């Protein structure tokens, strides 16, 4: 087994016996075989595009299946077997279309002609392809490092592309680049500089993917507005939705109208409460339950209703709640209820709804607690004049973007302590599940501006970027000259994509933790440090002094 795509890799050197995420070596190998098959599909789509043949089915399929191979998304080996069959079927169909149009015979590469042996172990075939990929790439470990960076980055981009496509937002340029990046992984003629440029291109395309997703969310559900979200359960029956997929949350809300259920969010669906159309249309869209993904074994066990996981992060479920757990879309786990989608991409949630209605629900009202969400780019930039005036008056000294992924490894208390120690004349912007280290802290206000502003989900890094660019334009300086520091945490491949976007934009002085990626070699890290001053976190006190100097 070889996997080092997430932050919690064993001893910081990659997982070689069993995934720290709970992924078995067999699932890892079948996932890698799927990626190999996608690498073979990619050159076929590139040729099809040249000939004007539609690749939409292949593009959407690639987005979903790359998403499924991300950390804590899908552990179901049989689903990957099906994906591999579908991949080969789509590839051969495109080949047939190409051959009907092409004026000369096409000579396909080995990877594009590969045929898995479905009567033999796919896991073993995946291991063989892993070894070949590693052996062909390790003549230059720095190039191999950047190849992995590109692969993990496009996995993150694919997840945002998948969600945007669900909401009707697509861009041929995004699809085409994902295929080009996959095809490039089998090229051995590219230099280190070429791979740096491809990695930065991932960042550029990921920015567009996040923009599409932002457009999908805001045109469908309205621009987020500051909203008070209850954290205290309410007496009555409920159903819990975890993950990131706001379209699926909206579908569940529609299917639970007049059912006598309160709908609670979990994890990164907290920011969904800021979308005005959801709050206005669905009065049973009540509150938020629990904290970050790594606490789900406790949160899910205690929740007295059904739980639907729409995306990552899914942990191997505990027997205390596996019967009331449901997965959808690219998410899966062996033995757990899976709700398949109709031709519009929406599951029938009846089984989950019936499960919740049979359960006791919350028997009492808990003491009121709440947090605020909804400070996305539209909200913040609408008060930019007020912000600028406060900066000029010295009321606001500095902005900190403290966000990213949360995780279970030690060292993440750094982010809690950092935010607690931020001076009272500074604003903290946050996003993604890293916020759960401090999301309920009462930091007060500067004037009528809250000192802690929740920008949204991990994909709402786009919102944070728009805020930074908007403030830079207003102050007539570059983003790097703003009184702004980025203190980021990472865990999985979406964070890799977002980091590449920030580097593509030329943003410097980012502090990253709690540990640096295992797939980044010392030479690549040196390049990032020298070019962008990317640096690891140290201690909250030391980093605060440096940021405010």
Curated annotation (Swiss-Prot):
It is found in: Cytoplasm. SUPFAM superfamilies: Prismane protein-like (SSF56821). It is an enzyme of class 1 (oxidoreductase). [4Fe-4S] cluster binds at residues 3, 6, 15, 21. Its EC number is 1.7.99.1. One of its GO terms (cellular component) is cytoplasm. Keywords: 4Fe-4S, Cytoplasm, Iron, Iron-sulfur, Metal-binding, Oxidoreductase. One of its GO terms (biological process) is response to hydrogen peroxide. The keyword Zinc does not apply. Coiled coil: none annotated. PANTHER family: HYDROXYLAMINE REDUCTASE (PTHR30109:SF0). Catalyzes the reduction of hydroxylamine to form NH(3) and H(2)O. This is Hydroxylamine reductase. It comes from Crocosphaera subtropica (strain ATCC 51142 / BH68). The lineage of its organism: Bacteria, Bacillati, Cyanobacteriota, Cyanophyceae, Oscillatoriophycideae. The gene is hcp.
